[in-house]
Amino acid sequence: KYIRSEELGLSFNRNKGLLVADGEIIGFPDDDCEYQDETLEKVVNFFLENEEYKIFSCRTLEKGKDYGTGIMAVEETDLKYKNVEETVKSITFFVNFQLEDLTLFDPNLGVGSHFGSGEETDYVLNLLHKGFKGKYFPNEIIYHPAKKGNYEDVERAYSYALGYGAIV
């Protein structure tokens, strides 16, 4: 489904989408990320073959580069409280929900809010707290521009730092 919103706030708008979603597997792509041809098929098959898992996460890289947004783990691993920061990025995870398990993002976190980042970390930590199990696959890639080295965008850096600080 495509829903257009005039209101700012990444988490606020993701929540709007979650509330009208009619599927069970939910992903959170950006408009500038790119899935590989088989990404969605792999996600669906993972959930079908591993019913105890409810979160699938993978790596992000800038296309044609050996780096991506932030530092990510290089080994396949279960998601744990202590490794969410290096195994989950906003665009790299999918959740297999049942309606009664629906969880919303904190609208105070993420782009467009005062605390301009950290929404995905907070979200996955909440899911783990609810008993969800997740798996990280470093060899599965979602491409996304890394936006590295833009040291002149102090406002963006400040907003992201506030979000990170709110999480830690």
Task: Say what each PLM segment does.
Residues 26:
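Short aromatic/hydrophobic "clamp" motif used to bind/position activated sugar donors
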Residues 30-34:
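The conserved acidic donor/metal-binding loop of glycosyltransferases
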Residues 107, 131-143, 157:
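Catalytic beta-strand/loop signature of glycosyltransferases that borders the donor
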Residues 5-21:
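Glycine-rich, basic loop-to-helix element that forms the pyrophosphate-binding segment
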Residues 110-125:
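Acidic donor-binding loop at a coil-to-helix junction in glycosyltransferase catalytic cores
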Residues 38-71:
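Conserved donor NDP-sugar-binding/catalytic core segment of glycosyltransferases
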